[in-house]
Swiss-Prot record:
Keywords: ATP-binding, DNA-binding, Endonuclease, Hydrolase, Nuclease, Nucleotide-binding, RNA-binding, rRNA-binding. ATP binds at residues 334-341. Its EC number is 3.1.-.-, 3.6.4.-. The keyword tRNA-binding does not apply. This is Endonuclease MutS2. PROSITE patterns: DNA_MISMATCH_REPAIR_2, SMR.
Length: 788
C-alpha cells in the first residue's frame, strides 16, 4: 500500500489509537511497522490472533503484561563482554518474570480447555529460565538496587556500614546537643564529599579542629568534619568502597550469567511484544465496539452497520456498505454536507484496517475483500503547495490512479469531475467510471452532477446511492441509501424556510422537463423505499415473534417430556420396592414353613415344587421398564372390551400379567398377580388374550412325599441356565430334607458353570459356606455346600 493513501484515509491516526494500549517497547515497534498487506494467509493469521485477543479480553480481561523496556541494546552489550548496571538487569529480570507469568497464564487457560487459533503457538515459543529468574529477583529489586541478599559478603559489609553510620551520628549528636551547640549555625548533621560534617560558625572554626569540607554562600558557615570522627569517617569510607567493589563484582557475575541465554531472552522479549500487540488490538476492538471480519473468498465487501473508527462510537451513524456482490461501482449523488465523504473514507479505512489484521467497527458476519492497492482522490487533500487549481489537482491524482489500477484495486473518488464546466465534468466522470469498470476495479465515487444519476441506472454492475436528508428538520441524517439517487431538496427546503410558493412554482417551470422528471422519479423511489422498509420491519417483527414462540413451545414440550419420564421412573421404582418387600416377606414365610415341617416331622404339608414355583412367580413380578402405557392398540382394545372375572389383563403400572378375581365396584378390581392379590383401578389395566397352557415342567427336585433327595447333585452335561435353575430347586429341597451339607458336581470344563454356581451360592441366604471338594472326591470339579 502506498504511504499517501494511509495518511489520506486516516490509517496513521488509527495506529495512534492503538499505541495507547501498548505497554512494551517491542509492542511499540510492532505498531510502528504495521501496514496493510494483500497476502490472504498472513491476513487470516493476523485476524485469528485478534480474535484470540478478543476472547481473552472477554474471559480474563486481557493478557497480563506489565510495562517493559527495550532490552535489545542490553543483549548486544553483554554479547561483546560489557557489564549491565542494576537498572538494566532489573529490566531483563522483568522480561524473565513476565515470561514465567505468561506461561502459567496460558497453561491455566489450556487446562480449562479454552481454545485459541494462534495464542498457544506464541506461548510455546516462550523459554522459561527459572534459575536465572530466581538469581535476578534475589539480587536486584525492581528499581535496579542491588539487595543485601545478592551475596553474603555484601550483606556483611552493609551491616558494618550501618553500624559505623550509627556510631558517627551518635558522636555528632553529642556535639550538637551539648555545651558546644552555641558554636554551630544549626543543630544538624549533614554530608559533604560523602563525609559526615556539622555547620560551624566562621568565628569558631578552631573550636572543633578537624577538616573543613565546604562553606556557605555567605561564608559565615563552615562545614567541618570534627577531629573526633575523622577515623570513623575514614573507616566508613573504606567500607563504602568495599560495598561498591562487591556490587561491581555481583553485576559482572550476573551479566556473565545472562550471556549463554541472550538469544532466548531476546526472543522472549519479541514474543511478549507480539502478545502485547495482540492485546492492544483487542483493547482497541473493545473501545470501538469492533469485531473481526471474515475474508470473502469472492472478494466482496459486506460491511454491516459500519462506523468510522475515528468518530465517537456513540454518535457515529452506522451504515450498511456492500460492494462486489451485485455491483462493483457505487455512485453517491446529492448535495454536500450530507456525509458522502465520510462514507467514502469509512469504506477505505475499514478495508485497510482489515488488511492489517485489526478489528473493525461493524456488526458480526461482516466480510472484507483483499485488494492489492487502495486508491483515493479526496476533496480535502488539494495540492496548495503546487498552486494547482481544484480541477487540475484532482485530475493529476486521477491520471496517476488510472495508470496503476487493475481488477484487484479499490478506488475512491470524492466529487469526481468537480472544478470545471458541469457538462464537461460530468462527461469526464462518466468516461473515467467506464474506464475503471472495464478494468474490473471496485469503485465508490461521490458527485453532485445529475447526469451521473442516470448513469447508475444504465450501466451494468453500477448502482446509485445517496445520503438521506430530513426535510422536516432541514438536516442530513448521514444514512446511506443504496439504490436511491440523491436530489438537492432545494424546493422543499426553500418552502419550509418561507419562500413564496409562487416563486417556487416559477422555478419549477424554469427547470427543464427532463430534470423535473428525474427529481420526481427520485422522490417516488424514496417513497417506495420507505414503504418497503416499513413493511420489512413489520415482517421482521412477526418472524422474531414466531421464532420466540416456537422456542418457548419447544422448551415447554421438553420440560413436559422430562417430567413425564421422571414420574414414570418414580412409579417403577416404587413398584419394584413394594415387590422386593413382598418377596422378602414370602422368603421368610417359606423358610418358616420348612422349619415347622422339619420340627413337626410332617412330610405331607406344602409340596416343595409349589413353594419354589410361588417364589419364582413372585420374582417375576419385578417391573421391567416397559412402555406399555404408550401402547395405543392395547389402550383401544381395553376400551372396547368389558371386563369380567377370570379375564387376563396387563397391570400398566407394573407391566405384569394378572387375572381378574372380582369387581370391587367404582372401577376397582381385585387382581391375582402371581401369588399376590392386589386392588387395581380399571384405568391401570389393559385386557389381553389368555396365554396358552404351558407344558408341565420337569424338575429334578420333588416333594418329600414323592421323591427322595440325594446328598449329591450331578450337573455335568447340563446347559448353564438349566443347571442354575436346578441348583436353586435342589438347595431348597435339601434344606427341607434337613441335610447339613450337600455336594454339587459341575465338572471342570471351561469354568463358566463353576463360576455361575459360586455366584449363586454367595448370595443365597441359607448357605453358610462352600468350598471345592477334596482332591480324592473331585477337587475343583465339585463344590461342597454347608447350610445355616
Amino acid at each position: 500500500m502506498n504511504q499517501r493513501i494511509l495518511s489520506t484515509l486516516g490509517f496513521d491516526k488509527v495506529k495512534q489509537q492503538l499505541l495507547q494500549f501498548i505497554v512494551t517497547a517491542q509492542g511499540t515497534n510492532e505498531v510502528s511497522e504495521l501496514l496493510p498487506i494483500a497476502d490472504e494467509n498472513k491476513i487470516q493469521s493476523w485476524l485469528n490472533e485478534t480474535q484470540d485477543g478478543l476472547k481473552v479480553q472477554r474471559l480474563r480481561g486481557g493478557i497480563p503484561i506489565p510495562k517493559l523496556e527495550n532490552i535489545q541494546p542490553h543483549m548486544k552489550r553483554i554479547e561483546i563482554g560489557a557489564d549491565l548496571n542494576g537498572i538494566e538487569l532489573a529490566q531483563v529480570g522483568r522480561v524473565l518474570s513476565t515470561t514465567s507469568e505468561l506461561t502459567r497464564f496460558f497453561d491455566e487457560l489450556s487446562e480449562n480447555e479454552v481454545d485459541f487459533e494462534r495464542l498457544y503457538m506464541w506461548r510455546e515459543q516462550l523459554e522459561v529460565l527459572p534459575e536465572l529468574n530466581r538469581q535476578l529477583k534475589q539480587a536486584i529489586d525492581d528499581d535496579g538496587y542491588v539487595t543485601d541478599e545478592a551475596s553474603p559478603a555484601l550483606k556483611a559489609i552493609r551491616q558494618n556500614i550501618r553500624r559505623s553510620e550509627q556510631t558517627i551520628r551518635e558522636e555528632l549528636d553529642s556535639i550538637i546537643r551539648g555545651k558546644n551547640a552555641r558554636y554551630l549555625s544549626d543543630a544538624l548533621v549533614t554530608m559533604r564529599n560523602e563525609r559526615y560534617v556539622i555547620p560551624v560558625k566562621q568565628e569558631y572554626k578552631n573550636i572543633f579542629g578537624g577538616v573543613v569540607h565546604d562553606q556557605s554562600a555567605s561564608g559565615q558557615t563552615l562545614f567541618i568534619e570534627p577531629k573526633q570522627i575523622l577515623e570513623m569517617n575514614n573507616r566508613l569510607r573504606q567500607q563504602q568502597i568495599a560495598e561498591r567493589n562487591e556490587i561491581t563484582r555481583i553485576l559482572a557475575e550476573l551479566s556473565a550469567e545472562l550471556v549463554p541465554y541472550r538469544r532466548e531472552i531476546t526472543h522472549n522479549a519479541y514474543v511478549i511484544g507480539k502478545l502485547d500487540f495482540i492485546n492492544a488490538k483487542a483493547r482497541l476492538g473493545k473501545e470501538l465496539k469492533a469485531v473481526v471480519p471474515e475474508i470473502s473468498q469472492a472478494n466482496h465487501v459486506v460491511f454491516k452497520q459500519a462506523r468510522h473508527p475515528l468518530l465517537n462510537p456513540e454518535k457515529a451513524v452506522a451504515n450498511d456498505i456492500v460492494i462486489g456482490e451485485e455491483y462493483q461501482a457505487i455512485v453517491i449523488t446529492g448535495p454536500n454536507t450530507g456525509g458522502k465523504t465520510i462514507t467514502l473514507k469509512t469504506l477505505g479505512l475499514l478495508q485497510l484496517m482489515g488488511q492489517a489484521g485489526l478489528p473493525i467497527p461493524v456488526e458480526e458476519e461482516s466480510k472484507m475483500g483483499i485488494f492489492t492497492e487502495v486508491f483515493a482522490d479526496i476533496g480535502d487533500e488539494q495540492s496548495i503547495e503546487q498552486s494547482l487549481s481544484t480541477f487540475s489537482s484532482h485530475m493529476t491524482n486521477i491520471v496517476s490512479v488510472l495508470k496503476k489500477v487493475d481488477h484487484q484495486s479499490l478506488v475512491l473518488f470524492d466529487e469526481l469531475g468537480a472544478g470545471t464546466d458541469p457538462q464537461e465534468g460530468a462527461a469526464l466522470a462518466i468516461a473515467i467510471l467506464d474506464s475503471l469498470g472495464a478494468k474490473g476495479a471496485y469503485v465508490m465515487a461521490t458527485t453532485h452532477y445529475p447526469e451521473l444519476k442516470v448513469y447508475g441506472y444504465n450501466r451494468a454492475g453500477t448502482i446509485n446511492a445517496s445520503m438521506e436528508f430530513d426535510v422536516d428538520t432541514l438536516s442530513p441524517t448521514y444514512r446511506l441509501l443504496i439504490g436511491v439517487p440523491g436530489r438537492s431538496n432545494a424546493f422543499e427546503i426553500s418552502k419550509r424556510l418561507g419562500l413564496d410558493n409562487s416563486i417556487i412554482e416559477a422555478a419549477k417551470q424554469i427547470m427543464d422537463g427532463e430534470s423535473q422528471d428525474l427529481n420526481e422519479m427520485i422522490e417516488d423511489l424514496e417513497n417506495r423505499r420507505k414503504m418497503a422498509e416499513t413493511e420489512y420491519l413489520e415482517a421482521r417483527h412477526y418472524v422474531d415473534e414466531s421464532a420466540a414462540l416456537h422456542k418457548e413451545l419447544k422448551e415447554a414440550y421438553q420440560v413436559f417430556f422430562e417430567e413425564r419420564e421422571k414420574e414414570l421412573q418414580k412409579a417403577r421404582k416404587e413398584a419394584n420396592k413394594i415387590i422386593a418387600e413382598a418377596e422378602e416377606n414370602a422368603e421368610t414365610i417359606i423358610s418358616d414353613i420348612r422349619k415347622m415341617q422339619l420340627e413337626s416331622g410332617q412330610q405331607g404339608g406344602v409340596k416343595e415344587h409349589q413353594l419354589i414355583d410361588a417364589k419364582t412367580q413372585l420374582s417375576q413380578l419385578h417391573h421391567e421398564e416397559t412402555k406399555l402405557a404408550k401402547n395405543k392398540v392395547l389402550k383401544k382394545a381395553k376400551e372396547q372390551k368389558k371386563l369380567k372375572a377370570g379375564d387376563e389383563v396387563i397391570v400398566n403400572t407394573y407391566g405384569q400379567r394378572g387375572t381378574l378375581l372380582k369387581d370391587n365396584g367404582k372401577g376397582q378390581w381385585q387382581v391375582q398377580l402371581g401369588i399376590l392379590k392386589m386392588n387395581v383401578s380399571e384405568e391401570d389395566m389393559t385386557p389381553v388374550a389368555p396365554q396358552k397352557e404351558a407344558k408341565p415342567r420337569v424338575t429334578t427336585v420333588r416333594s418329600a412325599e414323592s421323591s427322595h433327595v440325594g446328598t449329591q447333585l450331578d450337573l455335568r452335561g447340563k446347559r448353564y441356565e438349566e443347571a442354575l435353575a436346578e441348583v436353586d430347586q435342589y438347595i431348597d429341597a435339601a434344606i427341607l430334607a434337613g441335610y447339613p451339607q450337600v455336594t454339587i458336581v459341575h465338572g471342570k470344563g471351561t469354568g463358566a458353570l463353576r463360576t455361575g454356581i459360586t455366584e449363586f451360592l454367595k448370595n443365597h441366604r441359607s448357605v453358610k459356606s462352600y468350598e471345592f471338594a477334596p482332591q480324592n472326591q473331585g477337587g475343583n470339579g465339585a463344590t461342597v455346600v454347608k447350610f445355616q
